[in-house]
């Protein structure tokens, strides 16, 4: 939307600025004519994007960005698997991982295979035809949007020193994470995304 008024201590925005962000921490109100928002949860809307395009970004794109960059510590050349690559978060995750120059394997359903390829995936696994946890290939980073495999199964395909990040909240990651980190050098991490000024603009960088 467009900023109408700002508080006395607001420094990042002024009336007339076009902004986008997340209102979930401020009582929601996206369908209202006017809404009150914390400046920490907003960013200036890029001029080359519409309001509809930017409205789709704060949760899906930020979840993917924080999962891969902040929690996953993604690096150039890593083998990255995205489980649940056909949804909003997964689609952004493919593109973000490729921006980091990683080798990306996307896991999705049959109708979404071509979509995953178009978004940049190097390899695509149709989960209706193949279970990635039963393959010999190992991954440096697994970003899990679905949470439909056990930690034992995930452990088999996670490389030594690798990271497993789940945005679907994994009980296994919560309870076994400290033990796996101490004994096997693998990190199991749950992600609760939090849109903010540090990450919202980054989601529109490319």
What does each model-identified segment do?
Residues 1-26:
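Glycine-rich beta-strand-centered segment in the early N-terminal region that forms part
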Residues 8-9, 104-115, 148-151, 171-172:
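Short glycine/proline-centered loop/turn elements that form peptide/ligand docking sites
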Residues 14-15, 50, 75, 159:
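Residue-level recognition of short, solvent-exposed, well-ordered loop/turn junctions
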Residues 15, 55-126:
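Mid-domain Rossmann-like dinucleotide-binding core that forms the NAD(H)/NADP(H) cofactor-binding site
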Residues 20, 125, 140-143, 165:
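N-terminal Rossmann-like NAD(P) cofactor-binding module of classical short-chain dehydrogenase/reductase
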Residues 26-39:
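A structural motif shared across PLP-dependent enzymes of the aminotransferase-like
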Residues 133-141:
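A short acidic, Gly/Pro-enriched loop at the edge of an enzyme's catalytic core
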Residues 146-206:
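Glycine-rich phosphate-binding loop and adjacent beta-alpha segment
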């Amino acid at each position: 939307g467009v900023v109408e008024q700002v508080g006395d201590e607001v420094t990042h925005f002024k009336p007339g600025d076009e902004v986008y962000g997340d209102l979930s921490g401020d009582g929601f109100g996206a369908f209202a004519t006017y809404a009150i928002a914390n400046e920490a949860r907003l960013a200036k809307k890029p001029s080359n994007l519409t309001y509809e395009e930017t409205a789709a970004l704060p949760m899906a794109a930020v979840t993917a960005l924080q999962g891969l960059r902040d929690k996953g510590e993604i690096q150039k050349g890593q083998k990255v698997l995205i489980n649940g690559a056909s949804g909003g978060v997964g689609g952004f995750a493919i593109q973000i991982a490729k921006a980091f120059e990683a080798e990306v394997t996307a896991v999705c359903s049959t109708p979404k295979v071509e979509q995953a390829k178009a978004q940049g995936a190097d390899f695509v696994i149709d989960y209706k035809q193949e279970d990635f946890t039963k393959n010999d290939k190992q991954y440096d980073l697994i970003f899990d949007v679905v949470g439909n495999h056990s930690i034992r199964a995930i452990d088999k395909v996670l490389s030594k020193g690798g990271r497993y990040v789940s945005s679907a909240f994994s009980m296994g990651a919560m309870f076994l994470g400290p033990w796996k980190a101490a004994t096997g050098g693998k990190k199991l991490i749950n992600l609760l995304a939090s849109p903010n000024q540090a990450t919202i603009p980054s989601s529109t960088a490319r």
